[in-house]
From Swiss-Prot:
Pfam name, any one: ThiC_Rad_SAM
Cofactor requirement: [4Fe-4S] cluster
Positions bound to Zn(2+): 416, 480
Gene3D superfamilies: 6.10.250.620, Radical SAM ThiC family, central domain
Official protein name in the record: Phosphomethylpyrimidine synthase
Residues the entry annotates as binding substrate: 218, 247, 276, 312, 332-334, 373-376, 412, 439
């Protein structure tokens, strides 16, 4: 067995508080304890700390010792067991092909996670353990309690500052989130709690258009680059900067073991595209895929704790010819795999024909569907075509089938869409897919900016998030060019946090503006450190400031390098206010000298 040090598994990952912030915990019922982040302001501000949503997990709590070889504390395990509807069992044996045809001695692979649980949980016979099932029965789970506190994020403290001036396009965002509201949104299928019973380390979160807009970050090894140390750190790094979920899109060797390391150390939901690993098991030959291989892969990943699966069940045989005249054809990896299988066998997609079988598996572990858009447009010229919308209609049909089994569903969306075609995508999804949460990749609004596609896509992401998309899948500067590294992940996450927040502001989320206004006051009052700390990326903000004004004293200066001390507009405005205030005092004195009468007698 390979030694950890030999395989470059990190003994540590990025930890410690985000600068200017501290981890706090808000207590709820039944032992619920919700992590949040507070940004402390300078005493001169005379303001309360700014409380913000936090998905960085224990990694930013200095009081918690992180040992990735031990994994995180199983936060939800007691809640799961207390419901009395699960059982442990002897899990499937790990096979060489699970790790990409590695030999039995694991030579050339990464070390397995220490003390792997070979007795996963599943629903007892006849039971259904999904959050949707509980919600339909009127049950408020501990997960729902946790989410309500988390989504409110101190709204009660900000009650006086609430502003509802946005355009929500029909979304129903209450002033305060209650556990019962969370339950009802889950029961109606308008929101998803992605929380596999075998991933108890995950902190409950919700994806739905009546909640904060969430973002996902993609990580993963590939056939040409595979380093589990980098993948674990990418996950930690992504959630540090605000990724609400992470998808492991590994396509190379060591897939199973890499995923185990990530899951055991992830406080956020983990999603996968199971067809990628299934393809590895048949040596990359799409035609050799079978339902049996795919089913085995689903169970393998379910036992590990994957929280949501992208399933390309909407790529039907009849739709494939509709892509023939596209500029870029089928750009989805999963979509192209299934299209090739359908054409090779001239049969209907086995993910479609076995969809109810997939539902039976998912409801035993509470895994959510992320119904894949395998026919999404790969360029703006292909946007909103017959192939794309035919698949979307099918995803709506499959959503109804999943809900019949009380399996949670979200719908994946494009892609590449010019700005004027974005809203029709959202409107059509709400109708065709019965208001199931929309989860979109961007969309990219132009195709001319390789190297800057985090920007081209953030434009579309902000717009579609405003219109109602529940979760945005990030795009990094490396999109279409190569695999993102650690720095690319940060840029992608911060860019998409910006897009999601802009959408929350536009939707009229009651306290979304609170952080903006706190930063604006800090900017006007030249509280530089508060400006840095309130930003989405404090390190970069301070670094840019210090490139021209590196002296520590410059952080107390009432100007910046752009205007200089003589031409700072905000400094001049402050002086104008002082002069105006002084003038008002003089007029007040004159008023008092003349007896304080409102109406003076007319002069004779």
């Amino acid at each position: 067995m390979a030694d950890i040090s030999d395989q470059n598994i990190p003994g540590h990952v990025t930890t410690g508080p985000i600068r200017g912030s501290r981890k706090i915990y808000v207590e709820g019922k039944n032992g619920v304890r919700v992590a949040m982040r507070e940004i402390d302001l300078e005493p001169s501000a005379n303001e309360q700390p700014v409380r913000v949503y936090d998905c960085s997990g224990p990694y930013t709590d200095p009081n918690i010792k992180i040992d990735i070889a031990a994994g995180l504390k199983p936060l939800r395990r007691e809640w799961i067991l207390a419901r009395g509807d699960v059982e442990s069992y002897e899990g499937r044996e790990i096979k060489p092909e699970d790790n990409g045809q590695l030999g039995p001695d694991r030579s050339g692979g990464v070390p397995p996670f220490p003390n792997v649980n070979h007795h996963p949980l599943r629903a007892k016979a006849g039971a259904n353990v999904t959050q949707m099932h509980y919600a339909k029965k009127g049950i408020v789970t501990s997960e729902m309690e946790y989410i309500a506190i988390r989504e409110n994020c101190g709204r009660a403290q900000m009650k006086e500052a609430m502003i509802r001036d946005g355009e929500s396009f029909g979304a129903n965002i209450p002033d305060f989130i209650t556990p019962e509201f969370v339950r009802d949104e889950i029961a109606e299928g308008r929101a998803v709690i992605a929380a596999n019973i075998n991933h108890p380390e995950a902190e409950p979160m919700i994806i739905g258009r009546n909640f904060l807009v969430k973002i996902n970050a993609n990580i993963g090894n590939s056939a040409v680059a595979s380093d589990v140390a980098a993948e674990v750190e990418k996950m930690v790094w992504a959630i540090r900067w605000g990724a609400d979920t992470v998808m492991d899109l590994s396509t190379g060797r060591n897939i199973h073991d890499t995923r185990e390391w990530i899951l055991r150390n992830s406080p956020v939901p983990i999603g996968t595209v199971p067809i990628y690993q299934a393809l590895e098991k048949v040596n990359g030959i799409a035609e050799n895929l079978t339902w049996e291989v795919f089913r085995d892969t689903l169970i393998e990943q379910a036992e590990q704790g994957v929280d949501y699966f992208t399933i390309h069940a909407g790529v039907r045989l009849a739709y494939i010819p509709l892509t023939a005249n596209r500029i870029t054809g089928i750009v989805s990896r999963g979509g192209s795999i299934m299209a090739k299988w359908c054409l090779a066998h001239h049969q209907e997609n086995f993910l479609y024909t076995h969809f109810e079988d997939i539902c039976e598996i998912l409801k035993r572990y509470d895994i959510a569907f992320s119904l894949g858009d395998g026919l999404r447009p790969g360029c703006i010229a292909d946007a909103n075509d017959r192939a794309q919308f035919a698949e979307l209609e099918t995803l709506g049909e499959l959503t109804k089938i999943a809900w019949k089994h009380d399996v949670q569903v979200m719908i994946e969306g494009p892609g590449h869409v010019p700005m004027h075609k974005i809203k029709p995508n959202m409107d059509k999804e709400l109708v065709a897919c019965h208001e199931a949460p929309f989860y979109t990749l961007g969309p990219l609004t132009t195709d001319i900016a390789p190297g800057y596609d985090h920007i081209t896509s953030a434009i579309g992401a902000a717009m579609i998030g405003w219109y109602g998309t529940a979760m945005l899948c990030y795009v990094t500067p490396k999109e279409h060019l190569g695999l993102p590294d650690r720095d690319d992940v940060k840029v992608g996450v911060v860019t998409y946090k910006l897009a999601a927040h802009a959408a929350d502001l536009a939707k009229g989320h009651p306290t979304a503006h609170f952080r903006d206004n706190a930063l604006s006051r800090a900017r006007f009052e030249f509280r530089w450190k508060d400006q840095f700390n309130l930003s989405l990326d404090p390190d970069t903000a301070e670094s840019f400031h210090d490139q021209t004004l590196p002296a520590e004293g410059a952080k107390a200066a009432h100007f910046c390098s752009m205007c200089g001390p003589k031409f700072c507009s905000m400094k001049i405005t402050q002086e104008v206010r002082e002069f105006a205030a002084q003038g008002m005092e003089e007029m007040s004195d004159q008023f008092k000298e003349k007896g304080g009468e409102i109406y003076l007698p007319a002069a004779e």
